[in-house]
């Protein structure tokens, strides 16, 4: 379970977080967020096409695996409303994530939001025919006639699946293709594929306490024109647990941060090779927190060093 977040609120966010806690229930959170005089979320160009992509999205591992639980689905619908109201669009899933794909598809249909979403999912199986069958099932679950980004999950049988993804991209069934891994231990293979193959995206782990991607993967992505999606920006939740209850340093206000979660997300987004970050959440108040990291200034190199130092203080 993700630990509670420590937030230093300003008036707009105080109202929203009180609403999220159930203190005031006069309107949906997403409606109030949309009504605030808040700038739109930053976008960054997808290197292979120049298409602008909002910098903060939503991961669905565990958090969207709620099956037919209507109460949980209603909460997740509010999460997505907040994402869209803030100008976000990226939703990342996988057939590995239980019912997450099906729940995402149901919610996008309920919200009439398929056109607002940039839907990313993955193929995670061995063999060409099995890969095709799995991707077709993902499209059915997501209720998407076309997938924006199809990724090879954890590099599983990547040569076979990449050939299929190229065919699907050429035929218009997917718009972009890529590879993913969740641990820096796989970076040697990730790097080799990035050097040998033409990719639109790579999805990797990167956080203020796990900066291995800075050594080779992020510079190579910039060199090769590959978009970068970041998973586990909170170190799998361990960073939030470590920082829980600790007051924000004064320098956080310099980049408009009112929570440690925003500081950690802005640390990741400050790297110029990063295209988008996809923190997973199933709670509306956390999505409000996350999307604010896509607004305002990012830390410079000196401030990034202070963020890293704060983790070991």
Question: Residue ranges of each PLM-predicted region?
Answer:
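Generic structural signal for well-ordered alpha-helices
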Residues: 43, 80, 101, 105, ...
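A cross-domain feature marking catalytic cores of carbohydrate-active enzymes
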Residues: 57-60, 93-95, 121-123, 151-154, ...
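Glycine/proline-rich, positively charged
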Residues: 67, 126-212, 216, 223-229, ...
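Structured C-terminal cap/extension of enzyme domains
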Residues: 26, 216-313
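Conserved, mostly hydrophobic/aromatic
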Residues: 46, 58, 91, 104, ...
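Short amphipathic alpha-helices and their capping/turn segments at secondary-structure boundaries
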Residues: 40-51, 136, 215-223
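Short hydrophobic/aromatic-enriched beta-strand-loop microsegments
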Residues: 116-118, 199-204, 297-303
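N-terminal binding-site loop/beta-alpha segment at the start of enzyme catalytic domains
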Residues: 2-117
């Amino acid at each position: 379970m993700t630990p509670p977040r420590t937030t230093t609120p300003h008036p707009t966010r105080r109202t929203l977080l009180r609403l999220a806690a159930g203190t005031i229930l006069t309107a949906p959170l997403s409606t109030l967020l949309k009504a605030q005089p808040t700038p739109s979320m930053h976008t960054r160009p997808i290197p292979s096409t120049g298409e602008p992509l909002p910098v903060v999205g939503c991961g669905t591992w565990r958090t969207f695996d709620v099956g037919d639980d209507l109460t949980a689905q209603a909460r997740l619908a509010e999460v997505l409303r907040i994402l869209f109201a803030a100008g976000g669009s990226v939703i990342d899933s996988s057939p590995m994530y239980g019912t997450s794909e099906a729940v995402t598809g149901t919610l996008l249909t309920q919200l009439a939001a398929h056109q607002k979403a940039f839907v990313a999912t993955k193929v995670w199986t061995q063999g060409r025919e099995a890969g095709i069958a799995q991707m077709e099932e993902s499209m059915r679950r997501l209720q998407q006639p076309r997938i924006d980004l199809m990724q090879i999950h954890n590099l599983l049988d990547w040569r076979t699946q990449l050939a299929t993804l190229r065919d699907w991209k050429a035929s218009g069934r997917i718009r972009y293709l890529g590879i993913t891994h969740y641990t820096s231990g796989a970076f040697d293979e990730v790097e080799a594929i990035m050097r040998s193959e033409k990719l639109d995206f790579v999805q990797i782990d990167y956080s203020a306490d796990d900066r291995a991607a800075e050594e080779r993967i992020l510079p190579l992505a910039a060199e090769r024109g590959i978009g970068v999606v970041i998973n586990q920006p909170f170190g799998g939740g361990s960073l939030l647990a470590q920082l829980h209850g600790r007051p924000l340093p004064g320098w956080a206000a310099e980049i408009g941060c009112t929570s440690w979660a925003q500081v950690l997300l802005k640390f990741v987004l400050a790297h110029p090779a990063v295209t988008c970050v996809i923190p997973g959440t199933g709670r509306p108040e956390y999505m409000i927190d996350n999307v604010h990291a896509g607004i305002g200034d990012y830390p410079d190199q000196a401030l990034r060093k202070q963020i890293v130092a704060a983790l070991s203080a």
